[in-house]
Structure formats: structure tokens, C-alpha cells
Amino acid sequence: MEVMMLLVYDQPGVMQRVMGEFNRKRINVETIVVGKCEQREKARIVLSIMDKEKAMSVIEHIRALQEVIEVELVDQSRHEAYALLSAKEGICRVTGTVEEVDAIVNKSQPEKYVQTMNAI
């Protein structure tokens, strides 16, 4: 399974245009999570696709959309965990093995300072 992360402008119709590219290529999206992100007037889209070749075939078409700021295909072979953590002053992205991410989250005392927004 391939995980694709997009940073887009938070505007009406963006999801329709992004998903239209998957429809044109006949690519089935297994899961999708969308939400506002740490940057003002922007949103993050995280989706999963079963076939890496199909995921690679649609990336350039998605990058060409005006509303898309960034597209990243997450390398699953590294078995990394990604989490967006929201603190009072902003958001940070923690990357590492599952054990490393767990250790960082536990050290940060999330119940006091951090709210987990999305985790893959």
C-alpha cells in the first residue's frame, strides 16, 4: 500500500479536482483523510493506494493542479510512522520508526501540551 500526502489550498472544489485525476487514471483510493493543517488557509490530504505504479502515474498530474502546493509519496519500506501534533504555538511533524515516534510522543506528555490530529 502506498501513502500519498498532499498540501493544498483550502478552497471549495479542491477535493473534486484532486479526485478527478484519480478517476481519469482509473485508480481506486483505499483510504482518505482530509483536514485543515498547521498553515493558514491550507489543508492536508492523506490517501492510500494499493498499487505503487498507479500512484506514481498520477503524481505529476496532481502536481499540475493550481490548488496543489506539495505532493509526497511516503516510502512504506522504511516502516516509518507519521503523526501531526498540535501544540499551542503550532504543529510539528514527527518522523521515525514506530518506537521512536512513540518515545517522542510519550516524552512530550501529550495529555498536557499536545493534541494528536492525524496518525498513519
Enumerate the language-model features and the residues they cover.
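Long, contiguous binding/interaction regions
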Residues: 1-3, 7-42, 50-120
